Structures are given as structure tokens and as C-alpha cells.
A protein has these predicted regions:
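Extreme N-terminal leader/targeting segments of oxidoreductases
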Residues: 1-20, 38-42
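Flavin (FAD/FMN) cofactor-binding and adjacent substrate-gating region
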Residues: 2, 83-86, 106-182, 188-195, ...
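Flavin-dependent oxidoreductases
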Residues: 31, 65, 189-304, 312-323, ...
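Glycine-rich FAD pyrophosphate-binding loop
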Residues: 37-57
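Dinucleotide-binding Rossmann-like beta1-alpha1 core, especially the glycine-rich loop
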Residues: 62-139, 260-265, 269-273, 283, ...
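Glycine-rich phosphate/pyrophosphate-binding beta-alpha loops
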Residues: 63, 69, 157-159, 262-264, ...
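C-terminal catalytic lobe of FAD-dependent flavoproteins
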Residues: 269, 301-421, 427-431
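Glycine/proline-enriched, intrinsically flexible loops and inter-domain linkers
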Residues: 387-388, 394-807
Length: 807
């Protein structure tokens, strides 16, 4: 099947108008077109600068594995496999073969990872199971089992011809009315009032309402036409195909992955396809100083063979499959694949209205293509993410990723660790430090162990806070654990912990209609008078939790929003979107994150310490909970808000950056015990406080999450209120599951069962040092949420009993 056979309209005229224009004709663009058409939207034009599949699709390896660490991506890949199975029965089949996949462990640590993955596969109903060495050999007879500890087999994984897949989806889209125009180069994207309005090509201009950038390795270049930065880098990715030698009448072998040796195999006709992830990565047409500059004529082309970088992969392949040493090589593929800084897709609407992106497939785009097309079509037609897509949402990449150096260094680090075992609380090391708190030097001098989040250096804990090792968790949870966290936790519960939260995002909303705008955006009543602070959610149209933050009224028409470190770009993007789409153009939204430091002081002695530094009255009567006012410390006027994220008396202090470092030192000298973010995590988990992106996201509503107290009883016209009114009787609820053994710490994604039936999965977990328990959050069917209900949770293949606690 060729492009011309699919299109049969090579010389057709470009339309002057379409509702949606898709740029890019690889598996991403054709999947978006296919799914839009399947959902009834056929006023769609797809354009490609060359032939369909001429970018990265044609040289993809075509392996389809479904299980991923992210639950949403797993669901997307499951849709892909289901779709490819269905397309195989169509008039334009994509050569889908459901051969199954084997993953082997060449180390005991990898076998632990496999057993953990088998556990979370149960929560999706996927048939992933451990297999013996004998069965590994039966399913992949060429393997040398030396050093293999064990393995697992996924029955419904498979492989597909990438080009035929794209053409199959293109054919399906065309049948429903989508127009496809190849050899049509995009020159300009026009905007009006912050929204796309037209796509200018070398064949003419198409007026449109929506543009979807599926440009593959060219996606960043296309985005620059509207001044949007997409942090992707084309990376050299290599594999080879051997000469034919297998019996053409034998069943196709399962694919094989040996991550400890960085390699993968699948059958290609009667030969083998073998590739891997080199420890020495190489970017293409990108440097630390410049953006990508891909040649205009790079179509249906490959890069030069780089055997020096591939040498380790080749040697490992011959060790694992000795036959490789005897086989001739039919072709060696070195093709550029677009990677992102965290090895996840880059999807969604950008800061330019109705300009969407679906790019950065990180060499697993064939497995994800079907799911990408589905969620993007739903996102476009529904005007918001259809499920929890945060880990793939372009809004997760903040201003730091406008830096070519930061983006490239992080992408190379992650590429080289692609097949590593990733333990909890693992930290990336590239391009650090990038952003720091005003008190950074003090923290460094006092033995702070830093972590990084959204390019900010943050204190995890202080190494000189040495405690007992007796509570070190079992297994993986203990890998990056520190006894310092327990000391800092106790210091906060019993005295006063001081926390540098300067990385928290601060958004200022102002204007004559700022109050009206925020009352529309937020589910809670946020306008309670100057000096009042409110905890609230912002909901999507389905009643799901889009944002979770506090709002403080600074003046009649000026408000300060405090949200998580990683959510500045996301939350600001949501506010800008609602402002643009609902007629609040006169409202200003400004990011003040780098202008203000935030220090938290919490614990029973916090008032005593803070009162010693200010003449302002901090008594309960003068300074109630959720109130905010200016106070003076050391001759500096700062804002103090009585609020807590750890369940103790305390304040957050908002301080101009230039004045912040001396105030931190005063808090310390006055008796504050310096603590890090890992103590915050333990403290808030113990008190049942929630984190967006952890326990709450767009897939859950406030009633399910136990946040009904943060929903207004007075108004019914806030965004998402209509949907929320029908969700007051949830069928599932968020619960805490407690384990009496504090060292039995859940990591997340573990299956939960009752009476041998899987009923859910763990969302997050940790240690509660005050209660001396291990604690987890999970959403469970309502009949299992009664406090005291006993449940089993699987840890690395072994079931342990916990029970539902009172929240």
C-alpha cells in the first residue's frame, strides 16, 4: 500500500477553509485525523511537507508494548493495541501481529522490577505473568539464557509496520471525509487576538479555527511560527536488521527486551530487528547554544551509521543471541527521533489559543500512536484534556525549557538512562543548579541535600540531621531514604520547623474584574475581603479537579495565587484559557514566582518564634486561621498568611527576594528547625492533605476526593458547577490505607484486592512517623471505604494486609 493508493487525489486543490488543520502526516498526524473523523469531525485537512511517513515514522522499529509506569499512558497504549487489531481486519491492514512480548531480568534487581510491573498490570486487566527460563526459550528459541534470572510475558503486545499503520489510519480518515495534502509546506501560521486563524502554505492559505502540530522532528520549528517553544530534540536512535534466516512457516517469535543489557529484539520477516539505547547519546542538529536546524529537504532520509556508539549494543546482542555473530546485516538504521526532557509525549493546547501539539514521541510513538490520536481528538473536540494527561501535557514544561542547554542536557541524561531501573525519589543531575532560592547558599553551607523540581533546587533534607536507621523501609522504598526526614518531621510536630518553599509558584491576578473572574474560575468562595486566604480547586467542565491552590485577596482588585512548584505554567495556562474564552480580557495574570520567596514556619512553637521577631500581634484573636496581613521583621515589610500544609499551627511568609536570606537566618537563630520537602511530604500524608498530580487530578472530582468542604454553598455559576451538581453521590472515594509495619511502604500503582478481586491501585504512599505507620492513598469503590475495612496490597509479588483509616 502506497501513499498514492491511499490518497488517489495527488493534484486536488487545497481548500480555502477548514475547521481543523493538522500539520504532519506520520503516525501521530494520521491518528489524530482518524480519530477526529471517527468522532464525527470531518472538516479536517492534513498537510505534510513531503510524502506521508517521510519523517520519523518510516524508520521506527514498530514494537508495541502496553504497560508503562504512568497509568494514563498504559491506557493509551492499550487503546493502540486494540485499534491495530481492529485495523488489521480493514481493507488497509497495518501488518499487526500479536506475538506477545518477553522482558527478561539479567539481575536480581531487574527481577524485582518485573514483579512490581506484574502487580500493576493486574490493575488494568493485562495478562502479564512471570514465566520460567524454559518458557522464555520456547517463545524465543535463539536466546542464550546465561545470566538470566527470570522474565515475564505479555500476551497481547505485538508489532506493526509503522508506515502501513499510518497509511491505514489515513485511509480510514479519508473515508470519513478528511482531506490529505502531501508535498504542501507550511510557511506561516496566522493568529488573531491570541488564537490561530489561518495556515499559510506554499499551495495557498487555509483559514481555520484549530491547528494541530504533529510535525515530528519538525514540531519545534513549526511551533516557533507562533512563538511557542516545544522542548524536543532530535536524537540519533539506531537499530539493525539481519539477513533472512528463520523458517517462513514457523510462528512469529515474541519480541524480547533485555534492559539490563540495553537491547531489544523482534522478528522482521525471516530476520531479526535488534536495537537499543546507547550510554553515549547523540543529538542531531541541536547544540547547547542553538535550537534545532533541520535541513528543509530531510525527507525519507537517514543519518550516517555510527558503529562506534553502537558497539556495546552489538556486543550485548551477540552475548544474548549468539546467532547474531553469524548473521549478515541487511540494513543499519540510524534515524532521528524527537525526544522530550522526561521521555514522555508532548501533548495538548499551548499558550496560543487553539494551537495544539502532539509531538515528542521518544521512540515509543508507534505503541502510543493510537492512544495519542484518541486523546488528542477528545481534547480538541471537548476543549480540555479527557483524562489525567498531566505527565504528557505540554504545560508541564515551564520557562526553563526555553533554554536549549537545559533541554538538551536533560534529554541526553534521560536517553542514556532509558533502560535503567528508576527507584523512588531518584534525582536527575543535569544542568543543575538552574534556579535557586535566596537562601540557597545558607542551605548549602548547612549540609542540605538538594532535589530538583521544575528546574528549581529545593532542600530534600539536611544530611547533618542524623536519626535512627530502624525505620528504613524495605526494598525499593529504602533506596533513597534518609533518617533525617524523621527528625525533621518530629521537630515540626513537637517544636517549629522552618521550610524554604520559594520554588512554589506565585500568580498575581488583578484588574477591575479580577474578583468576578476568580469567582467564576474557583469552586470555593474566594472573595471574602482583603486579607483573607482561601483553599480552593478550579474545575474542568466535567467537574474534575484542574487546579488546586490557595487564593489570598491582597487588595480589592488584586489577588495572589500560591500553587505547586511544577504547576506554574499549567495553572497560569488554565487561567489564561478561561480568561480568553469567557470574556475577561481586562484581567491581568502575572507570574511573580521569581520575585517573592516563601518561608513556612509550622509547629506548636511557631507563634512563639515568629512573635519574637515582629511587633505585630499574632494571637488567635488578632490573626485567625486563613487570614493574611503585612508584618515587619527586621525592618522589612513582608506578608504573613496563617495557613498550613502539614496540619500544625503556622504561617507562610512572602518576602521580596532581595530581603529573604537574612530573614531565613533570623528564623533559624530564633529557634526554627530547618526542614526539607520530604518532611513536608510525610507530614501532609499523615494529616490527609492532598497534592495535585498525586492524589487528585482532572479524573477525580471534589466529592470523590473528600474536598466537599472547599465547594461553595452560595454560588452555582462557577466553571464546572453544572457537572459537579450531578456528582454528589460518588461511586468511589479517596481513602487512606494504613499498614501497621511502618517499613512496609507502598510506592504507588500497587494492586489492592478484597476477597481475591482487584478493586483498585495505590495512588501514593509514605511513612507517618508520628503515628508510626506506613500510609497510602487510593480511590476505592464506595463499599470498601468504611474505616477498618481490611484489604490486601501486593508488594513485589507478595500480598500484605492493610486497613482503611479514618481521614
Amino acid at each position: 500500500m502506497s501513499t498514492e493508493q491511499v490518497l488517489n487525489q495527488k493534484d486536488s486543490q487545497l481548500p480555502k477553509r477548514a475547521r481543523i488543520v493538522i500539520i504532519g502526516g506520520g503516525v501521530g498526524g494520521t491518528s489524530v485525523a482518524y480519530h477526529l473523523a471517527q468522532m464525527g469531525e470531518s472538516d479536517v485537512v492534513l498537510v505534510d511537507r513531503n510524502d506521508l511517513t517521510s519523517g520519523s515514522t518510516f524508520h521506527s522499529a514498530g514494537m508495541v508494548g502496553q504497560l508503562r509506569a504512568d497509568p494514563t499512558l498504559t491506557k493509551m497504549n492499550m487503546h493502540s493495541a486494540s485499534l491495530y487489531r481492529e485495523l488489521q481486519q480493514s481493507e488497509t491492514p497495518p501488518s499487526w501481529v500479536e506475538c506477545g512480548s518477553i522482558k527478561i531480568a539479567s539481575s536480581p534487581e531487574r527481577m524485582e522490577e518485573i514483579r512490581r510491573q506484574i502487580g500493576w498490570a493486574k490493575t488494568f486487566g493485562l495478562d502479564l505473568h512471570e514465566i520460567s527460563l524454559t518458557e522464555i526459550k520456547e517463545r524465543f528459541p535463539l536466546i542464550n539464557l546465561e545470566g538470566v534470572v527470570g522474565g515475564c510475558f505479555m500476551t497481547t503486545d505485538g508489532q506493526v509496520d509503522p508506515s502501513q499503520l499510518a497509511l491505514s489510519m489515513a485511509a480510514g480518515a479519508r473515508k470519513k471525509g478528511v482531506q490529505i495534502h502531501t508535498f504542501t509546506r507550511v510557511l506561516e501560521i496566522k493568529t488573531i487576538a491570541g488564537r490561530v486563524s489561518a495556515v499559510v502554505t506554499d499551495k495557498g492559505t487555509i483559514e481555520c479555527e484549530i491547528v494541530v502540530n504533529c510535525g515530528g522532528i519538525y514540531a519545534a520549528e513549526i511551533a516557533r511560527l507562533v512563538d511557542v517553544r516545544i522542548p524536543i530534540v532530535p536524537m540519533s536512535h539506531q537499530y539493525l536488521i539481519t539477513e533472512n534466516f528463520l523458517d517462513p512457516n514457523a510462528p512469529i517469535m515474541a519480541s524480547l527486551r533485555d534492559p539490563d543489557n540495553l537491547i531489544y529484539f523482534r522478528q522482521e520477516v525471516q530476520g531479526l530487528l535488534m536495537g537499543g539505547y546507547e550510554r553515549t547519546s547523540k543529538a542531531w542538529k541541536t547544540t547547547r547554544e542553538s535550537l534545532d536546524e533541520i535541513p528543509k529537504n530531510f525527507n525519507n532520509m537517514l543519518l550516517a551509521e555510527d558503529w562506534d556508539r553502537f558497539e556495546e549494543i552489538a556486543a550485548n546482542s551477540q552475548m544474548r543471541v549468539p546467532k547474531m555473530a553469524e548473521l549478515g546485516i541487511k540494513s543499519f538504521i540510524n534515524g532521528p527521533e524527537a525526544f522530550t526532557p522526561d521521555n514522555e509525549f508532548c501533548l495538548g493546547e499551548t499558550e496560543v489559543g487553539s494551537f495544539y501539539v502532539a509531538a515528542g514521541y521518544c521512540a515509543h510513538g508507534i505503541a502510543g500512536a493510537g492512544g495519542i490520536g484518541k486523546v488528542m481528538a477528545e481534547w480538541i473536540l471537548g476543549n480540555e484534556p479527557p483524562m489525567d494527561l498531566w505527565h504528557m501535557d505540554i504545560r508541564r514544561f515551564g520557562p526553563a525549557y526555553r533554554s536549549p542547554a537545559f533541554t538538551l542536557d536533560r534529554i541526553q541524561e534521560n536517553y542514556e538512562q532509558y533502560y535503567d531501573i528508576h527507584y523512588p525519589q531518584e534525582e536527575r543531575q543535569s544542568c543543575r543548579p538552574h534556579k535557586v532560592s535566596p537562601a540557597y547558599d545558607w542551605h548549602k553551607d548547612h549540609q542540605a541535600e538538594f532535589g530538583e523540581k521544575a528546574s528549581w533546587e529545593r532542600v530534600n533534607f539536611y544530611r547533618n540531621h542524623v536519626g535512627t536507621e530502624s525505620n528504613r523501609p524495605y526494598g525499593w522504598a529504602g533506596k533513597n531514604w534518609s533518617s533525617a526526614v524523621q527528625l525533621e518531621h518530629a521537630a515540626t510536630r513537637e517544636g517549629a520547623g522552618i521550610f524554604d518553599e520559594s520554588s512554589f509558584a506565585k500568580l498575581e491576578v488583578s484588574g477591575l474584574r479580577a474578583s468576578q473572574f476568580l469567582e467564576f474560575v474557583c469552586a470555593n468562595d474566594v472573595v471574602k475581603g482583603v486579607g483573607r486566604a482561601v483553599y480552593t480547586q478550579a474545575l474542568n467542565s466535567k467537574g474534575g479537579i484542574e487546579c488546586d491552590f490557595t487564593v489570598t485577596q491582597i487588595e480589592n482588585d488584586r489577588f495572589l495565587i500560591i500553587t505547586g512548584t511544577a504547576f506554574a505554567h499549567h495553572d497560569a495556562g488554565w487561567l489564561h484559557k478561561l480568561r480568553r474564552e469567557h470574556g475577561f480580557d481586562d484581567v491581568q495574570i502575572e507570574d511573580r514566582t521569581e520575585q517573592l520567596a516563601i518561608f513556612g514556619i509550622w509547629g506548636p512553637k511557631s507563634r512563639e518564634i515568629l512573635q519574637s521577631l515582629t511587633s505585630s500581634d499574632l494571637s488567635n484573636q488578632a490573626f485567625p486561621f486563613l487570614h493574611s496581613k503585612e508584618i515587619d521583621i527586621n525592618g522589612v515589610t513582608i506578608r504573613a498568611t496563617r495557613i498550613t500544609y502539614v496540619g500544625e499551627l503556622g504561617w507562610e511568609l512572602y518576602i521580596p527576594v532581595k530581603d529573604a536570606a537574612p530573614i531565613w537566618q533570623l528564623l533559624y537563630k530564633s529557634g526554627g528547625f530547618p526542614c526539607g520537602y520530604r518532611a513536608i511530604e510525610s507530614l501532609r500524608l499523615e494529616k490527609g492533605y492532598l497534592a495535585w498530580g498525586g492524589e487528585i487530578n482532572t479524573e477525580y472530582n471534589p466529592y470523590e476526593a473528600g474536598l466537599a468542604f472547599a465547594i461553595s454553598k452560595k454560588k452555582s455559576d462557577f466553571y464546572g458547577a453544572k457537572a459537579l451538581s450531578n456528582l454528589k453521590s460518588p461511586t468511589r472515594r479517596l481513602v487512606q490505607i494504613v499498614f501497621d509495619d511502618i517499613k512496609q511502604v507502598p510506592l504507588g500503582s500497587e494492586p489492592i484486592r478484597s476477597n481475591n478481586q482487584v478493586i483498585g491501585r495505590i495512588k501514593s504512599g509514605g511513612q507517618g512517623y508520628t503515628v508510626n505507620k506506613a500510609i497510602a492513598f487510593a480511590y476505592l469503590p464506595i463499599e470498601f471505604t468504611e474505616p477498618g475495612t481490611k484489604l490486601d496490597v501486593e508488594f513485589f509479588g507478595v500480598w500484605h494486609q492493610g486497613y482503611v483509616a479514618q481521614m
